[in-house]
Design a protein with these regions (language model features):
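Active-site regions of enzymes building and remodeling cell-envelope glycoconjugates
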Residues: 35-44
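A hydrophobic C-terminal alpha-helical subdomain
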Residues: 213-273
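Short phosphate-engaging motifs
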Residues: 34, 189, 262
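Oxidoreductase cofactor-interface core, primarily capturing Rossmann-like NAD(P)-dependent enzymes
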Residues: 1-27, 31, 44-50, 54-56, ...
Length: 273
């Protein structure tokens, strides 16, 4: 199988879990991953696309939205995978893609995949717990204060290891296809996430609800753009006011034979690693 984004948040776990199954894994990208066989893949160089997929039975596709031009090229990459003979393709999507406009790149990528003569799995995760440790909010972990405009509403955050587990299940012969929502085992508040990390790391960490303007200014002070801060503040605000509610899904339990990881289990794993 071929894995795009093999060094990323989900891709590295897909590679590791597929290797654990004894599969031959091509870790495709511009640099070698921690496991798997490296194969060159560059979103800006179409000559690398076919060789990365040729001979693979399955592929995991991640769209790097921070790579200029990649979202627009995603349909062509997916078509290239199918043209190379890949029979099963799992696309990393998002939990709320059905509510996105028709020209949304993720929605277009999903529709492209579904139009092809392949077994298609749409991996639709909710927000990553990993965003608190290696993502946009990592700086807040270092200061001991998670300052977000998210109010007190609960949310079913997911561990990226669970996203990978569902993807690997979908890439197996006779694996599940179609939309696969991936959430944590329960909805929890940001207070609960902070408490889990505090307990695992053995140092103070608390959640403090703040106004959107303060949050945006905080992100700007750490090098993020105003537009990115405004985008996150809008999403968090919808959680706070109850207009963005995600039900807990049992996808991990149904297809992986175990329940999804809790925030406490995620935090302990992060602390140990």
């Amino acid at each position: 199988m071929t894995v795009l984004g093999a060094t990323g948040k989900t891709g590295r776990h897909v590679v590791a879990q597929a290797v654990e199954r004894g599969w031959v894994v091509r870790a495709a990208g511009r640099r070698a991953a921690g496991a798997g066989e490296f194969v060159a893949f560059d979103w800006d160089d179409e000559s690398t696309w076919h060789p990365a997929f040729a001979g693979a039975d399955a592929a995991y596709v991640v769209i790097p939205f921070n790579h200029a031009g990649a979202p627009e090229k995603a349909p062509d990459v997916i078509r290239a995978a199918a043209a190379a003979g890949v029979a099963r393709i799992a696309l990393l999507s998002t939990i709320d893609v059905d509510h996105a406009p028709d020209d949304d790149p993720t929605k277009v990528a999903e529709q492209t995949l579904l139009s092809l003569p392949v077994e298609a799995a749409l991996i639709r995760p909710t927000w990553f717990l990993d965003n608190f440790t290696v993502g946009s909010f990592r700086g807040m972990l270092d200061t001991g204060e998670l300052r977000l405009p998210a109010g007190e509403a609960p949310f079913p955050f997911v561990d990226t290891r669970d996203i990978a587990a569902v993807a690997v299940a979908a890439l197996a012969p006779d694996g599940p296809t179609g939309p696969l929502p991936v959430t944590g085992p329960e909805s929890v508040t940001h207070h609960a996430v902070a408490e889990a990390l505090e307990a695992a790391l053995g140092r103070p960490f608390r959640y403090i609800p703040v106004p959107a303007a303060e949050f945006i200014a905080l992100l700007e002070s750490r090098g993020f753009t105003h537009s990115y801060g405004d985008f996150l503040a809008d999403a968090l605000g919808k959680v706070a006011n109850g207009s963005f509610v995600i039900p807990v899904a049992d996808t991990v339990e149904r297809h992986c034979g175990r329940r999804a990881y809790t925030p406490a289990e995620f935090a302990r794993h992060f602390a140990q690693s």
